[in-house]
Amino acid sequence: MIKQLWNKIPFTDLFLEASTWGRIRNGVTKRNIKIYTRKDSGYRYFSTYVNEKIKTTYVHRCVMAAHNPINGYEKLDVNHIDFNPSNNKISNLEWCTESENMQHSIRNGR
């Protein structure tokens, strides 16, 4: 079994960490953040309260930004290789363009 590693999520003002297993935690207290699943798409997300507003953030973007950061990632999609949007393990995710993401779906009959 691959060891779970934690890295800071670079695009949040809060000190949050994402694991290679697709978990999110508070980097100070080390307590896990509650993760929800969108009923319409199956994507996993969490909510934070920043500047008196609720901000929703997708787990797959956090995992990739924390463990596989690249320049310009804000403009890229994250592809779930196995088509399971709730599988946010780093081994199942890859950066891609919107076009590449669509081609991946078409090639695999999705």
Language-model segment annotations:
Residues 1-77, 82-110:
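Conserved recognition-core residues within compact binding domains
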